[in-house]
């Protein structure tokens, strides 16, 4: 019981990181879409890094909660990873290299 509680608590920080990273990915994708072609590369790089961060943090949550498949945070991280991936796809298709 103590281990389960510790793992549950250990999921808090990576969940917060996944949330923040997904928000960064979505914002950077919008910036990439609106920016001048010569400046879009930085925003696209930000999307890719943020998506990777979201995915890595989500995986930590999944590992920590592996013994609690009913935990609603697992669905939350699935959604966050999906959103970050959508942002990545949007950024990569919105701009072609100049």
Which residues are covered by each model-predicted region?
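N-terminal glycine-/lysine-enriched basic segments
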Residues: 1-68, 72-98
């Amino acid at each position: 019981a103590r281990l389960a509680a510790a793992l549950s608590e250990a999921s808090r920080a990576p969940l917060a990181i996944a949330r923040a990273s997904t928000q960064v990915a979505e914002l950077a994708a919008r910036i990439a879409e609106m920016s001048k072609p010569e400046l879009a590369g930085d925003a696209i790089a930000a999307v890719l890094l943020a998506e990777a961060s979201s995915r890595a943090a989500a995986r930590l949550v999944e590992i920590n909660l592996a013994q609690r498949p009913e935990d609603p945070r697992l669905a939350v991280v699935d959604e966050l990873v999906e959103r970050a991936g959508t942002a990545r796809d949007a950024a990569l298709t919105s701009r072609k290299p100049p």
